[in-house]
C-alpha cells in the first residue's frame, strides 16, 4: 500500500515524531459506530461540509470546546473509512475529505494548546491524504507538523517535516507551494543565523510562487492573502532577528502584515502584532513594543489562541530586562495577569 511505504520513509526522517500507520492507529482509537454499510458521494459531501463548517468556526472564536467538538466529529466520521464503496474513486474522495477534516481538527487542537492531539490529527491527515493521492493536502498536513515542531523548539523535526512537504512541489498549485516555502523558511530560521541564506532563499521562493497564483487553488486555501504571506515571512525572519540577525527585515514584514489585515481583530493579525512586539522588545524600542503588546492583549477579548498566548509570553520574557521602563513594567504586569504561567520574577 502506497500509504504505508510513504509513512515508512517519513518515519525515518523525523526522529522525534512517532509514525506507524496513522490511519490504522487513529481508527483503532476512534469512537466505534455500527458498520456504515455502503458509502457514496453523499457521505463524502457531508465530511467536506463538516470540514468547512469547522474551518469557518476556527477563523472565529477558537477554544478548547471547539477543538473537542471537531475531534469527536472526526472520530465518528472516521468510521466511514470501513464502509463499502461502489467505486474506487469514491473511496479516494472520502480519504481526501477525511484528510481535510483531520487537518482542520489538528489546527484547532494546536490553537487550543492540545499539542498531542494536534500531532495525532495532523498525522492522520497525512495518512489519509497520501492514500487519496491528494498532494496538496498531504503537504498542508506535513507543514502543520512542521509548525507544531517549531512551536516546540524541535529543530530537526521542523526541518524534516517542512522539507517532506516540498517533495514533488511541482504537483502543488502556486499559492499552496508558496505556503510550503514559508514553512520551510520558518524551520530554517529556527535552526539559527548560520541558515540565514537558506531562510532568505526560501522566503524569495514563497514570494515568487505567491505572485504566480492563478486562483486555481484548493478551496481550503482561499483564506490565504498577501497579509498572511507577509506575516509568515516575518515569522520566519523573527527567529533570525532575536538571535543576532537583522531585525529590520522581520519588523518590516510583520508591520506590512498588520497593515494589510482587515481592521477587525483576528487571530492572524493579533499573532502578527504579538510577533512584532517580540522582535521590537528584543532588539530596539521597548516603549513601542509595549504599545504593541497592549494592542495584542486588547484583541484577546475576542481572539482566543494558545499560539498568540505563546507569542505574548515571548514578549514578557524579552520585556523582563526593560522592566525599569514604566510602559514596559505596566505591560509586564498586565501580561502576568492575563496569561497563565507567565509570572517572571
Where are these regions (language model features)?
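Compositionally biased, long intrinsically disordered regions
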Residues: 1-44
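Conserved binding/catalytic microenvironments
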Residues: 34-345
Amino acid at each position: 500500500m502506497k500509504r504505508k511505504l510513504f509513512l515508512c520513509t517519513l518515519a525515518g526522517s523525523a526522529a522525534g515524531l512517532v509514525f506507524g500507520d496513522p490511519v490504522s492507529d487513529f481508527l483503532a482509537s476512534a469512537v466505534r459506530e455500527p458498520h456504515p454499510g455502503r458509502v457514496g458521494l453523499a457521505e463524502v459531501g457531508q465530511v467536506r461540509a463538516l470540514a468547512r463548517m469547522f474551518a469557518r468556526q476556527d477563523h472565529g472564536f477558537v477554544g478548547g470546546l471547539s477543538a473537542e467538538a471537531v475531534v469527536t466529529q472526526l472520530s465518528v466520521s472516521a468510521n466511514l473509512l470501513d464502509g463499502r464503496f461502489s467505486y474506487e474513486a469514491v473511496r479516494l474522495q472520502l480519504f481526501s475529505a477525511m484528510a481535510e477534516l483531520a487537518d482542520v481538527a489538528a489546527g484547532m487542537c494546536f490553537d487550543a494548546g492540545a499539542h498531542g492531539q494536534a500531532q495525532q490529527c495532523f498525522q492522520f491527515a497525512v495518512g489519509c491524504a497520501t492514500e487519496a493521492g491528494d498532494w496538496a493536502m498531504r503537504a498542508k498536513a506535513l507543514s502543520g507538523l512542521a509548525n507544531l515542531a517549531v512551536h516546540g523548539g524541535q529543530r530537526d523535526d521542523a526541518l524534516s517535516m517542512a522539507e517532506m512537504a516540498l517533495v514533488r512541489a511541482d504537483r502543488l498549485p502556486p499559492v499552496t507551494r508558496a505556503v510550503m516555502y514559508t514553512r520551510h523558511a520558518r524551520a530554517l530560521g529556527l535552526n539559527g543565523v548560520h541558515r540565514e541564506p537558506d531562510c532568505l532563499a526560501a522566503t524569495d521562493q514563497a514570494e515568487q510562487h505567491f505572485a504566480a497564483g492563478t486562483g486555481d487553488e484548493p478551496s481550503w486555501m482561499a483564506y490565504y492573502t498577501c497579509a498572511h504571506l507577509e506575516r509568515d515571512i516575518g515569522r520566519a525572519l523573527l527567529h533570525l532577528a532575536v538571535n543576532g540577525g537583522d531585525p529590520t527585515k522581520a519588523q518590516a514584514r510583520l508591520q506590512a502584515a498588520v497593515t494589510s489585515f482587515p481592521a477587525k481583530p483576528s487571530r492572524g493579525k493579533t499573532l502578527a502584532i504579538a510577533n512584532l512586539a517580540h522582535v521590537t522588545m528584543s532588539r530596539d524600542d521597548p516603549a513601542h513594543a509595549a504599545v504593541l503588546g497592549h494592542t495584542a492583549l486588547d484583541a484577546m477579548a475576542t481572539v482566543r489562541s494558545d499560539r498568540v498566548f505563546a507569542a505574548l509570553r515571548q514578549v514578557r520574557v524579552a520585556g523582563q530586562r526593560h522592566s525599569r521602563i514604566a510602559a514596559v513594567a505596566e505591560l509586564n504586569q498586565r501580561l502576568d495577569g492575563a496569561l497563565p504561567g507567565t509570572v517572571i520574577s
